[in-house]
Amino acid sequence: MVFGTGVDNVELSRIQKALTRSERFVEQVLTTMELEKYNNFQSTARKTEFLAGRWAAKEAFSKAYGTGFGKALGMHDLEIKNDELGKPYFSKHPFEGQVHLSISHSNLEAVAFVVLEKN
């Protein structure tokens, strides 16, 4: 049974502006493991795309979960990894059930869709 759905999109230019304003922005969004992957990318464009995708995915999860971000849920309560085929998934989350995630990018934006499913 579907518990919740969430979708979020973010313009890459908005993420780039946030990076320009604050070097700590990355650390506020990404977990230690995600930050290691981010730092391994060579190009600024790829880093921005990766960060935008993680931002959108975490925002989409917070909407599907029904709380948004605040006391009940923070960015670091969520962690995203990729399986052996490259498919992203939440490796860390507070939901007791299945979590489905899709992330897509274009030259201008990133979008993510999350479905939370209870057994």
From Swiss-Prot:
GO terms for cellular component: cytoplasm. It is found in: Cytoplasm. Mg(2+) binds at residues 8, 59. Keywords: Cytoplasm, Fatty acid biosynthesis, Fatty acid metabolism, Lipid biosynthesis, Lipid metabolism, Magnesium, Metal-binding, Transferase. One of its GO terms (biological process) is fatty acid biosynthetic process. It catalyses: apo-[ACP] + CoA = holo-[ACP] + adenosine 3',5'-bisphosphate + H(+). InterPro entries: 4-PPantetheinyl_Trfase_dom, 4-PPantetheinyl_Trfase_dom_sf, ACPS, Ppantetheine-prot_Trfase_dom. Its cofactor is Mg(2+). The keyword Amino-acid biosynthesis does not apply. Coiled coil: none annotated. Disulfide bonds: none annotated. GO terms for molecular function: holo-[acyl-carrier-protein] synthase activity; magnesium ion binding. Its EC number is 2.7.8.7. It is an enzyme of class 2 (transferase). Transfers the 4'-phosphopantetheine moiety from coenzyme A to a Ser of acyl-carrier-protein. Belongs to the P-Pant transferase superfamily. AcpS family. NCBIfam families: acpS (TIGR00516), pantethn_trn (TIGR00556). This is Holo-[acyl-carrier-protein] synthase. It comes from Lactococcus lactis subsp. cremoris (strain MG1363).
